[in-house]
């Protein structure tokens, strides 16, 4: 890929720091997780643009595409297994059809056996064809507030079930980011623990 680990880890720390600095306990419960994801995505895409990558919103999904147009990177919140070499990490929140199609595209290029079919048939109007040949890597991040660290890995998903990754072909464990030197990232009782490490999650309820 031609990227150094710091090109991926540093923006994530900066994004997390920015989200924490702007946090207010009066905001909706989902806003903090969304802010973390949004700030990390913004900082990451800004850094990768400097290195010749191009930011795109593919079907409204924010991605950075490599200079040769063969691969993309997506920042996604992970669970507590993130960046554990012997772990089995998953994305923290379920993902939709766009992500499922990206995983299916990865699987087509992979020789590893799979157990499910990810792609959803969106019909003739599907706009994914322009990016169908991209190999999409996931920059998985997890803020461990107990250890006061940010764990990250850059991994290639090739199977998923109901919006969650169930199989990775390759996982690159990135250096753990010690947050003890960032005083504004220290644990705060006012920061909702369940929102701290997640992407945004919406629940739709029918109202009669």
Question: Model-predicted segments: where are they?
Answer:
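Nuclease catalytic cores
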Residues: 33-37, 41
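Glycine-rich, aromatic-bearing surface loops/beta-hairpins
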Residues: 128-208
